[in-house]
From Swiss-Prot:
Binding locations of carbamoyl phosphate: 50-51, 100, 128, 131, 260-261
Function: Catalyzes the condensation of carbamoyl phosphate and aspartate to form carbamoyl aspartate and inorganic phosphate, the committed step in the de novo pyrimidine nucleotide biosynthesis pathway.
Pathway of action: Pyrimidine metabolism; UMP biosynthesis via de novo pathway; (S)-dihydroorotate from bicarbonate: step 2/3
Keyword tags: Pyrimidine biosynthesis, Transferase
This protein's encoding gene: pyrB
Family classification: Belongs to the aspartate/ornithine carbamoyltransferase superfamily. ATCase family.
Signal peptide: none
Protein name stated in the entry: Aspartate carbamoyltransferase catalytic subunit
A GO biological-process term: 'de novo' UMP biosynthetic process
Pfam families found in the cross-reference section: OTCace, OTCace_N
Subunit structure and binding partners: Heterooligomer of catalytic and regulatory chains.
């Protein structure tokens, strides 16, 4: 496996292998440094806390080191250098690259010019495969991935984590329930592609009508930075919120996930309920990304 650009690059066996490795990696490499002498280049052209820091933590725990390019404003891209040329240059400095970029397809483009593995840390409204592996790993800690009912609520138009997760779940015969503000549902192309892959996708007008059927509720924030019209954001900014009163008749094993950052779509009073798994989900970023790094760098 040279690059991890899209969840489409992974079949079910590869996903299951990475998830299994994530569960074993901390013990497997305790006291060992399999990536000693290796350098991970972190090229983040959009803001990031969890993805950047968990990749860095994963690399350090494996004995390697990191080189952080920073944003466009501190790189030669501010002088007009192309992404392709930047990748060509950094390929000579590092042993793998994690790339986050605002343009859909940027990671795929980077892989065409890179001599070292590229891991997609999020490309605009496209995909976020490492987050999807974390999501699947977190779900699998409490239930089987097969045949689950999952609700995707929030900005499904621009939310790349929901796109990647929905595609991954086609390997597991999931029932995908979508709840989104008007105009922010799954793009038609993704909806149609999911159904072509055999997925059952059911659209709902409100979370109340489906919450009691769900095994997993995946909540996302509105992607304010991707709205072409800022006025549209304010029109829908308070259109959904998960509160304890919504959770009075849910399945006992319900897992509420959120890729974070949270704005106001989950009330903080939900945090201490047994259903809240989003901070555990964030912690899982380290072992999952350790598994990914050893997959492409060892």
């Amino acid at each position: 496996m040279n690059h991890i650009i899209s969840i489409h690059d992974l079949d079910r066996d590869q996903i299951d292998r990475l998830l299994a490795r994530a569960g074993e990696v901390t013990a497997e490499f305790a006291g060992k440094e399999p990536l000693k002498g290796k350098i991970l280049g972190l090229l983040f052209f959009e803001p990031s806390t969890r993805t950047r820091m968990s990749f860095e933590s994963a690399m350090l725990r494996l004995g390697g080191s990191c080189m952080n390019l920073g944003g466009v404003e501190v790189s030669s891209m501010a002088k007009g250098e192309t992404l392709a040329d930047t990748i060509r240059v950094v390929s000579g400095y590092a042993d793998a690259i994690v790339l986050r970029h605002p343009k859909v397809g940027a990671a795929r483009l980077a892989s065409e010019f890179s001599e070292i593995p590229i891991l997609n840390g999020g490309d605009g409204a496209g995909q976020h495969p490492s987050q999807t592996l974390i999501d699947l790993y977190t779900i699998r800690q409490s239930m089987s991935l097969d045949n689950i009912h999952i609700g995707l609520i929030g900005d499904l138009m621009y939310g790349r984590t929901t796109h990647s997760l929905a595609y991954a779940l086609t390997h597991y015969n999931a029932r995908i329930h979508t709840i989104a503000p008007k105009g922010l549902g799954l793009p038609d192309s993704i909806h149609d592609n999911l159904e072509e892959r055999g997925a059952t996708v059911i659209e709902h007008d409100s979370i109340e009508e489906v919450i009691s059927d769900l095994d997993v509720l995946y909540v996302t924030r509105l992607q304010r930075e991707r709205f072409p019209d800022p006025a549209k954001f304010y029109d829908v900014s308070s259109s959904y919120r998960i509160t304890p009163s919504l959770l009075t008749d849910v399945k006992e094993h319900l897992a509420i996930l959120h890729p974070l950052p949270r704005v106001d779509e989950i009330d903080p009073s939900v945090d201490n309920l047994p259903y809240a798994r989003y901070f555990e989900q964030a912690r899982n970023g380290v072992p999952v990304r350790m598994a990914m790094l050893t997959e492409v760098m060892v």
